[in-house]
Amino acid sequence: MGADATGDTAARGDRAAHGDTASGGATGGTAGNIATVDLHPSLLPLAFLVGTWRGEGVGGYEGMESFHYGQEITFAADGRPALGYVSHTWWADEPRDGREPGSPMATETGFWRVQPPATEPGPDGKVNGSPVVEVMLAHPFGIAEIYVGTVTGTRIDLDSNVLIRTATAREVTRSVRLYGLIEGGDLAYAIDMEAGGKPLQSHLSARLHRSPS
């Protein structure tokens, strides 16, 4: 949904991200070398995200020709208990369907929050001791999403909890996201989507480099 609008998301983190997100933690940078002067204490598990990331990814879906896109994501801290989030994507493929390289594609805006780890057992009977992540996103094509998941080291697993759409928006019924740091300190992600009556499947994945401050 992030490029123009995941199945096992983790298995596809290396498809277009060109690397593997680590299980539980990731190789590369850590929060220790990120300036966190404006970071609310509750957001320390997400400190590794703070800053601007830029790179390229690949997208596709059943019935859709695959495509490449460029992306810039900014996670901003201002002292409050939520990271501000803005993502912009643009066409990075050959001209097609009226799109030229650099043509704007999609925008996501929202906030990321962290809650204490769950204390009650989940469906598997186990207590997940990882901090809970809540993500709220809005899209200009008529959809708003709330994701709930966990952060373990520098890996974040998210599943859509609420999807709201306008009467004219396309039908999206579920979205699953995986974010994580990979080798070299890059940020990789993969997004699976269930939409239009089609099963949950790979939609987007990318590898982003941290932009200089």
From Swiss-Prot:
GO terms for molecular function: heme binding; metal ion binding; peroxynitrite isomerase activity. Its cofactor is heme b. Heme b binds at residue 203. Residues 1-10 have a biased composition (Low complexity). InterPro entries: Calycin (IPR012674), Nb(III)_bact/plant (IPR022939), Nitrobindin (IPR045165), THAP4-like_heme-bd (IPR014878). The keyword Iron applies. Keywords: Heme, Iron, Isomerase, Metal-binding. The keyword Isomerase applies. It catalyses: peroxynitrite = nitrate. Residues 1-26 are annotated as: Disordered. It comes from the Bacteria. Its EC number is 5.99.-.-. A motif (GXWXGXG) lies at residues 51-57. Gene3D superfamilies: 2.40.128.20. CDD domains: lipocalin_heme-bd-THAP4-like. Binds 1 heme b group per subunit, that coordinates a highly solvent-exposed Fe(III) atom. PANTHER family: PEROXYNITRITE ISOMERASE THAP4, THAP4 PROTEIN. Forms a 10-stranded antiparallel beta-barrel structure able to accommodate a hydrophobic ligand in its interior. In fact, this fold hosts the heme group, which is located in a wide surface cleft. Belongs to the nitrobindin family. This is Peroxynitrite isomerase. It comes from Parafrankia sp. (strain EAN1pec).
